[in-house]
Structure formats: C-alpha cells, structure tokens
C-alpha cells in the first residue's frame, strides 16, 4: 500500500463513475432515437451529430486513459503505485489498458465515422438542450480532472496518509 496507488485508486473511482455513466448516457441518446444498440446499424454519425461525436470522443478518451483526461491520472498513479510492488501486475494492467483502448477506438470509429448507409440515420438529430445540459458538464469534468488532478488529490492526501499509517501499524511496519 502506498500513497500513489491509493490516490490513483480514488481518482480512478471518480473518473470511472463519471466516464462510465456518461458513456451509458451516450448509448441512451442514440438508442432513444434509433431503438437499437447494434453497432452495425450505425456509422457516419459525425455528419449528423457533431456535438454528440465530440462529447462521446471525450468520454471514450477518458475511458482509455488518454493524457489530459481523468482516466489517465487514475491509471497512471495506480500503475506507479503497483510498480513499487510488482512489475508483473503492471504488465497485466497495461495489457488491459491496451485492450480496452483497442475496443473503444474500434467502437468510436464504427459508430461515429464512415458514410451514413442507414437511411434512418440521415434524419437523426444532434443533442437537444436537455442532453447537452447533462453531457457537456460531464465532459468538462473529465477534462478538468485530467488537467488539474490536484483539485481532487490534495483533499485526499491527509486521509490517505492516515490509512497508510494505520495499515503499517496494523501490519507491524
């Protein structure tokens, strides 16, 4: 147990809550319009839904842990903390990060880019005011946490140090 690992875990929990919730909302937006979750149904949404494509991209990049997003901060700190104990664990974690990046990039490419082949998609509308008022603040949060992580990390430092010291006392270190 070390401070980097615990700080990373806390930031990752916050990030995962925001990003995963936002990705589910993004799925809900297109499901609400098209009533299907089949990836093969979509393609070319950037042409009809540029705001949706932008916020979806921010959440997808946060999910894969791109630097400048909340996902990077948490993943980086967890990996730094884990590296102090086991490089094998780090290799496993890094492999999972790479696999999730491949899946998310494929998903984004398939849904957002390409040519609109489905006639129903030619009439799809971009985000309405309600959807924007929910998704845009979440996208801003993903970026703010990624650029200014100390906003969240600094208030956690003392409690994390107390957890570590209690852990060390309990384990006779």
Question: Which sequence ranges carry the predicted segments?
Answer:
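Functional transmembrane alpha-helices
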Residues: 1-125
């Amino acid at each position: 147990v070390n401070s980097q690992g615990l700080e990373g875990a806390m930031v990752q929990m916050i990030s995962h809550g925001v990003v995963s919730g936002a990705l589910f909302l993004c799925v809900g937006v297109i499901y609400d319009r098209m009533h299907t979750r089949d990836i093969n149904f979509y393609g070319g949404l950037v042409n009809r839904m540029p705001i949706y494509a932008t916020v979806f991209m921010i959440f997808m990049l946060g999910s894969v842990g791109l630097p400048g997003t909340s996902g990077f901060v948490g993943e980086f700190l967890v990996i730094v903390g884990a590296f102090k104990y086991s490089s094998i664990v780090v290799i496993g974690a890094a492999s999972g990060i790479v696999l999730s990046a491949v899946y998310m990039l494929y998903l984004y490419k398939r849904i957002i880019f390409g040519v609109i082949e489905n006639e129903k998609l030619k009439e799809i509308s971009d985000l309405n005011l309600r959807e924007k008022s929910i998704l845009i603040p979440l996208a801003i949060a993903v970026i703010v946490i990624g650029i200014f992580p100390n906003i969240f990390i600094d208030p956690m430092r003392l409690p994390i140090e107390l957890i570590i010291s209690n852990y060390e006392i309990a384990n006779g270190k």
